[in-house]
Amino acid sequence: MASCASIDIEDATQHLRDILKLDRPAGGPSAESPRPSSAYNGDLNGLLVPDPLCSGDSTSANKTGLRTMPPINLQEKQVICLSGDDSSTCIGILAKEVEIVASSDSSISSKARGSNKVKIQPVAKYDWEQKYYYGNLIAVSNSFLAYAIRAANNGSAMVRVISVSTSERTLLKGFTGSVADLAFAHLNSPQLACLDEAGNLFVWRLALVNGKIQEEILVHIRQPEGTPLNHFRRIIWCPFIPEESEDCCEESSPTVALLHEDRAEVWDLDMLRSSHSTWPVDVSQIKQGFIVVKGHSTCLSEGALSPDGTVLATASHDGYVKFWQIYIEGQDEPRCLHEWKPHDGRPLSCLLFCDNHKKQDPDVPFWRFLITGADQNRELKMWCTVSWTCLQTIRFSPDIFSSVSVPPSLKVCLDLSAEYLILSDVQRKVLYVMELLQNQEEGHACFSSISEFLLTHPVLSFGIQVVSRCRLRHTEVLPAEEENDSLGADGTHGAGAMESAAGVLIKLFCVHTKALQDVQIRFQPQLNPDVVAPLPTHTAHEDFTFGESRPELGSEGLGSAAHGSQPDLRRIVELPAPADFLSLSSETKPKLMTPDAFMTPSASLQQITASPSSSSSGSSSSSSSSSSSLTAVSAMSSTSAVDPSLTRPPEELTLSPKLQLDGSLTMSSSGSLQASPRGLLPGLLPAPADKLTPKGPGQVPTATSALSLELQEVEPLGLPQASPSRTRSPDVISSASTALSQDIPEIASEALSRGFGSSAPEGLEPDSMASAASALHLLSPRPRPGPELGPQLGLDGGPGDGDRHNTPSLLEAALTQEASTPDSQVWPTAPDITRETCSTLAESPRNGLQEKHKSLAFHRPPYHLLQQRDSQDASAEQSDHDDEVASLASASGGFGTKVPAPRLPAKDWKTKGSPRTSPKLKRKSKKDDGDAAMGSRLTEHQVAEPPEDWPALIWQQQRELAELRHSQEELLQRLCTQLEGLQSTVTGHVERALETRHEQEQRRLERALAEGQQRGGQLQEQLTQQLSQALSSAVAGRLERSIRDEIKKTVPPCVSRSLEPMAGQLSNSVATKLTAVEGSMKENISKLLKSKNLTDAIARAAADTLQGPMQAAYREAFQSVVLPAFEKSCQAMFQQINDSFRLGTQEYLQQLESHMKSRKAREQEAREPVLAQLRGLVSTLQSATEQMAATVAGSVRAEVQHQLHVAVGSLQESILAQVQRIVKGEVSVALKEQQAAVTSSIMQAMRSAAGTPVPSAHLDCQAQQAHILQLLQQGHLNQAFQQALTAADLNLVLYVCETVDPAQVFGQPPCPLSQPVLLSLIQQLASDLGTRTDLKLSYLEEAVMHLDHSDPITRDHMGSVMAQVRQKLFQFLQAEPHNSLGKAARRLSLMLHGLVTPSLP
């Protein structure tokens, strides 16, 4: 491998620019290598689906998508404190160095609820360990979903694959250790790559065949056995760019990069498959098709491949990012093109290139901007790869005021359009979405906003599926399928499009600690009032189609560039050069305040205080006073329509300002402005449409203003009035999005073709028709009286509304049909079940809603919980809700009750005004009854032609109108009376029938419980048969089978649910009683056995019974058997012992005597020669000792004399040098003191002689130190500190603080320092806490404690000084959060807060 040091850096950088085409002008043509219009991102697993709102001509969309943006005044620094609620959405980022402080509600221990803008659908339940995973746990494509798990029995690693469309599942096995990383080639690719901790590579091709998932192994590369496990391994796919002529994009790039601990490997899968046919293959057997890149000192963390596969970018924990030129087919070694440390050598954890792979512009170069992250992405930086300069820095920090401050651990992912960066915190239950803006021409890129969304659990890993533009309803609860229903096949808007706003939809699959979930986030992005144009208004005759105006809507109506084009950044100005967070430039150097500044009242403080962070309470006219800037951030309101009676002027809607630290501390508002929860009710709001338009200068056009624009053209719509609690409650909103809202699209499509009508009828009585109309308002198109029904009901339409009233609504059609029927008999309609049983419908889902969900064209994938699939399938099939109501109403006749009013058959109920009737049945009934309506329309057409006899015709028409009004009033009265009677009768019958049936079932259940749990199944079958027989006699023939099916589906679950608690109670009661009996028996038996009376009685009885026989038996046995035998045995034993002892003693004495004699003889023989030798040795030793003593004495005497001579000489030299040094030091000190004294006397003489005093700033520093030292030695502490503080030199103040101990200064009962000196000392010591922090903090604590609050000067100046000190302490804590002195700094900050708060006005 070529060495990096031997390559010229400039040549390598230029070569890298040539490869990436970074030096090419942005607007220049690129005919040599035109790029296709779409691309893929391997890191994000592929391609996004196109946006339905922005499809069309890409050229026109790009042209209209470019917007003129005003320049942003970027600041140096900004601190954003998130609040944890839904108001933390789209908070503007206005600086190049931004610190984002996490909210306290996002912590795991917080009880805060999740965000209302996030919708969660569980996919699978599994417990993942909460830790930071360097790889991905999940991979997402358009067809499949793959995630890593472990087996429950042996803990082996597996990958679960789920089909998104059919929920079919399969398992992929064969891994060693855990799965380190997995990824699809792109969203439309079926190729899944997995890498385990041992480095084994698996590549499968997935396919759905006959409803089953078939997996085919494409590549399996096996590492040698014994390879150490490492969880830092990563998979990087090469972004695949198909040719423009290709229709299918399911094929993927053959190049993939593997990041190991010490190296990176780039593999060509096509070459591997061509050279090997069987798998697995050991890596040692592969000779071609890969290349190895080495050059980092520690493990690799991230990487990226260029689209052409010739450049590899790697990031490592050693802090380096390196670019390598690679050629797999050739023999050239990888060459390092460029390297640099983006985060000052800290470990890197993120490497993202901001390329728009969703729709790539051929004129835009790749790898123009780069995002890097360090320390688990706690710090993010935006880089320009042309100049290698940092454009923006984002830092994430924990809440410093929280009791447990856990540093963030962020997982980041960039969407394919490079417009949104999504982050999840492993240590917090939160998701962040940051908006990214780019300007290729100017070379600028930055993050423009951040949004916070709270979750219920932390996200460990996630995969992005869709990031697209959408239309947000005013309730913000409808899912994407129903929002997309507002666009028909011909491009026609639905009814909900007029009440929508531009928004962003993000679909994710997230791995939480407890489950895998499908997460959808909808929010309104940050809008610029100068850029966003209002939605185009339409007259009553216009058809709501897009047609040629669709590109304009995508670029202007949505407030963003069309999909596929790079976002325009003309409003971004030149970003300044990066600077340290706490560095002080020449303009921002703090001015040190002398004690004289605190001797004046507060009026003069404005002329002295120049620090930008200090706040003054004086007059605003002073030019030198600076007040903290206040930035109020509020969420954009997305409520429905505003009641004109409840609207407020703009000046009344105020927000409490938040403190902004260090330039622009942006606080997100804890709440959002809520509009009136009322809907627009016809008749209740007769005000004209122009009063509904909110007024006020500079108002941002939100969803409310967009709706107001619509209300200027359209009369108030007929909507049911919503209660305030239902409007505000997130639970009600969530339930509404999954229940009632899914029935609207089919019916709303009919209402769309009719146009918008005028105000609702005012002549209707609210008590009689409000219930029926409210039910029809929920599920039918907006009712408006037609030209035929208007005269009958006595309604006066507004001017110009006649051409919009040609088509009647469902309620009007029913009333017209009844009014035009020749038969005089009036039949009542079905009761308003939606009004009476709303609580029941809200708690238990009805059958009609579930069947209508299945009929929708757009629906979410039918995910099922893996552990609850069988239980959920049991209740999947149910019948229509109207059939259930009809069956209950008909069955009431079989229990002995009578209905006084005649009833319609069930068929007529479904065709004459039931609010649950499907649109198909309504259309069928309209077709059958169309003769009367057609006749009335023909009559109107004829009337429209001017006849000759106008007066007669007018008189005849007036008479007919009067008759029609009279007949209509009578009809309405009869209809209301019969409706009320029928509702009360049916309600009473149903209640009595349910009570009777409940009593019978209760008795049967009690008998069943008495017989036992084993006969439960048989009893359920008998109850089902009895119920079927009882109901079949009272129900009509057409409803018999539906009722039987309903009973089979409803009664057994109810019986089983009723049996289970009763059986549980019975078993619990029996077990409780048995436990009590057992405990009492044990207690009684133990007491009985432990009773002394019982024991004594048993002992006495046994003793009395056994005493006599036992004594006689023992006595006889002992005397006859034991004694004789024992005497004989003892006698024989003693005799044997005596004989043996006597013989042994004699033999021992004989042997001892012989041995002693022989031993004595041998010792005498050996002693004689030893004695002779000892005598000779003693004489020899004496002579040698005498000679040695004489020799040693002479040598010792000579050596002692020599050593004494040497030691005395060296001692003289050392004593001389020491005396010289001491004398020299003492003389120098004395001379310095003399010089200081002389200088002081000279200066005093000069001051007394001169007319003006000499400024102390001109004194020499050494002279000042000498004078201060003299004052300290004399005990004048106040004068010494005052002279040092007056010099305005922080080094001189530190010299005094180091010289004098704090205990010596503040230990005296009256503090020797005056109050101005104390205030000046506090201000100067707090100006810079970066050096000698321990000394400064100790003096600051003592000085703050000795401030006199009763002193007027101290009370006047203490507020501003303490505020400045608190700000400096906050900056110190932010800059050095892990400093050992952080605890003392926090304690001092809390002390200052307690001192300042009571004194503030």
From Swiss-Prot:
Q: Coiled coil located at which positions?
A: 954-1025
Spell out which residues are annotated as carrying Phosphoserine.
3, 6, 560, 565, 583, 585, 676, 708, 723, 725, 729, 741, 844, 871, 875, 879, 887, 890, 892, 967, 1380
Please state the protein's primary subcellular location: cytoplasm
Where do the segments described as Disordered lie?
23-42, 545-565, 603-628, 662-702, 717-741, 778-808, 868-946
Ranges: WD repeats: 121-164, 167-206, 217-269, 287-326, 335-385, 389-426, 432-475
Spell out the residue ranges making up region: Sufficient for nuclear localization: 913-934
SUPFAM superfamilies cross-referenced by the UniProt entry: WD40 repeat-like
**Bias regions of kind Polar residues — which residues?**
663-675, 722-741
Which sequence ranges are marked TM in the entry? none
Location of N-acetylalanine modifications: A2
The keyword Repeat is assigned to this record: yes
Query: Which protein family is named in the record?
Result: Belongs to the WD repeat EDC4 family.
Known partners and oligomeric status = Part of a decapping complex consisting of DCP1A, DCP2, EDC3, EDC4 and probably DDX6. Part of a complex consisting of DCP1A, EDC3, EDC4 and DDX6. Part of a complex consisting of DCP1B, EDC3, EDC4 and DDX6. Interacts with DCP2. Interacts with RC3H1. Interacts with NBDY. Interacts with TEX19. Interacts with LSM14A. Interacts with DDX6. (Microbial infection) Interacts with rotavirus A non-structural protein 2; this interaction probably plays a role in the sequestration of EDC4 in viral factories. Interacts with rotavirus A non-structural protein 5; this interaction probably plays a role in its sequestration in viral factories.
- Stated role: In the process of mRNA degradation, seems to play a role in mRNA decapping. Component of a complex containing DCP2 and DCP1A which functions in decapping of ARE-containing mRNAs. Promotes complex formation between DCP1A and DCP2. Enhances the catalytic activity of DCP2 (in vitro).
What name does the UniProt record give this protein? Enhancer of mRNA-decapping protein 4
Lineage, highest ranks first: Eukaryota, Metazoa, Chordata, Craniata, Vertebrata
